[in-house]
Swiss-Prot record:
Induction: During aerobic growth, expression depends on the carbon source, with the highest expression on succinate, a median expression on glycerol, and the lowest on glucose. During anaerobic growth, glucose does not inhibit expression. Belongs to the UbiX/PAD1 family. Dimethylallyl phosphate binds at Y153, R169. One of its GO terms (molecular function) is carboxy-lyase activity. Disruption phenotype: Cells lacking this gene produce very low levels of coenzyme Q(8) during logarithmic growth, grow slowly on succinate as the sole carbon source, accumulate 4-hydroxy-3-octaprenyl-benzoate, and have reduced UbiG O-methyltransferase activity. In contrast, they synthesize near normal levels of Q(8) in the stationary phase. This is Flavin prenyltransferase UbiX.
Amino acid sequence: MKRLIVGISGASGAIYGVRLLQVLRDVTDIETHLVMSQAARQTLSLETDFSLREVQALADVTHDARDIAASISSGSFQTLGMVILPCSIKTLSGIVHSYTDGLLTRAADVVLKERRPLVLCVRETPLHLGHLRLMTQAAEIGAVIMPPVPAFYHRPQSLDDVINQTVNRVLDQFAITLPEDLFARWQGA
């Protein structure tokens, strides 16, 4: 069983993280480990009709963001890596500065030190120079910066289509193949 850590921070776009967990429920060889910041819990209730319990039930394992002794806080606990979807600027800053005041940033720090993939789906706009510098620093220490920017070549017809394309592309970063892609991949013109 392969393990993937799914972090959800307080940035707008909680539905992306929810959809990722929904999709991974059907991938039998992936065990999901969910950690949500306190702000994510608030954003979830503001932006979606999902309850915290419903989202937690989508994950195989749920960790309290305050539990610094959780399995995912150690490099000896093997994972494929971690995605934070969405990733707030606060969380990005904590990761860049190794300020591991909770499990979300601690798990990300561990993934980086173990040289495993860390995908940060930074959700903020517009960006000022400080934000851009943080993203540059994160990339320099090994993170993949992957803002949830929609593509239009597959001609999305709904918000779900936009979300699905981002989720599928995130899974590509971990070489997780779905039985059927969630969007039409570019085949050339």
